[in-house]
């Protein structure tokens, strides 16, 4: 079991046990309200591999490679305050492939990756719009919020050896790989450098929350949330700068460093020589493999379903969300 899955399972156990712990303890001090739930999302990536090769643009996403994921959610806010605080643990998968790019240079480069990541995010949210009312015995509310904060991300890019790779037959014969096998790229040092598996990111985005309380004081919350992550790394896709010296790599690392081959050249296209996409012995300026001036980004759009774990007094619940006098039916 890899580290990402272990962290997710541990967090799931903690969230499952949390309601029982809260019930067993006295109410939180200073009127804090707590809610916990599960989330599902789709995730995309923007970096050195894209639909058209435009960095940091949502339209550059390869939409057919968007991946699904799940997460755990915990939110707390102090009664009467507008700011809420969120703790989220998400399993996020991103993926990209030059073979699906409309950019001819990227197409011939023929690199690809997938990255199964674990994100631990601490964010704050601020309501931009709040609406509410009643429907029968239910108290309903809508909140449109701005959200932002910091996150710790564990990532591990992987790739498979292309069956058209010039080294494929030799690698399979020697037992370095099998058909369809995914390999960890960071340990293979495909650009001759090391990079961190834990990085800091900045999630920022918007959310809309629908709240429904059947009269128990413990409302349900359904949230639609979209978050964009700003990162300081250019290695989520294992593509950063230039082709590295193959003599300093393992055979498998060499295969992943350059996956370009003659079979990738489009017919009738005026393309550079295949040597453009590999290390040049004795050259003072090596061929560019990626854009070192940019940083990778990723995003998620998903739904969270959560339930309040601590009771909110009915009167306080109304006063907090709905301004004005309460009207009682005297009849």
Which role does the model predict for each range below?
Residues 34-38, 83-87, 120-122, 142-150, ...:
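Transmembrane beta-strands of outer-membrane beta-barrel proteins
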């Amino acid at each position: 079991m890899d580290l990402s899955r272990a962290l997710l399972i541990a967090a799931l156990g903690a969230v499952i046990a949390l309601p029982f712990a809260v019930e067993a303890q006295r109410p939180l001090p200073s009127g804090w309200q707590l809610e916990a739930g599960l989330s599902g999302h789709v995730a995309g990536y923007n970096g050195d591999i894209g639909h058209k090769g435009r960095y940091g643009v949502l339209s550059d996403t390869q939409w057919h490679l968007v991946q699904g994921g799940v997460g755990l959610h915990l939110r707390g806010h102090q009664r009467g305050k507008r700011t809420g605080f969120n703790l989220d643990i998400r399993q996020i998968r991103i993926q990209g492939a030059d073979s699906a790019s409309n950019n001819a240079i990227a197409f011939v480069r023929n690199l690809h990756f997938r990255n199964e990541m674990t994100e631990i995010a601490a964010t704050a949210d601020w309501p931009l719009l709040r609406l509410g009312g009643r429907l029968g015995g239910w108290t309903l509310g809508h909140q449109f919020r701005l959200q932002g904060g910091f996150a710790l991300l564990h990532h591990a890019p992987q790739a498979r050896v292309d069956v058209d790779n010039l080294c494929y037959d030799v690698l399979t014969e020697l037992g370095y790989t099998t058909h369809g096998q995914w390999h960890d790229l960071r340990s293979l040092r495909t650009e001759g450098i090391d990079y961190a598996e834990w990085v800091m990111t900045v999630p920022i985005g918007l959310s809309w929350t629908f709240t429904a309380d059947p009269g128990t004081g413990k409302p349900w919350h359904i949230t639609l949330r979209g978050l964009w992550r700003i990162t300081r790394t250019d290695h989520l896709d294992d593509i950063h700068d230039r082709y590295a010296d193959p003599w300093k790599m393992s055979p498998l690392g060499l295969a992943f460093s350059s996956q370009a081959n003659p079979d990738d050249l489009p017919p009738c296209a005026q393309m550079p020589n295949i040597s453009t996409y590999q290390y040049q012995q004795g050259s003072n300026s090596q061929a560019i493999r990626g854009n070192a001036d940019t940083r990778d980004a990723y995003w998620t759009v998903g739904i969270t379903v959560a339930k309040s774990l601590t009771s909110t007094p009915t009167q306080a619940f109304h006063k907090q969300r709905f301004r004005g006098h309460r009207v009682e039916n005297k009849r």
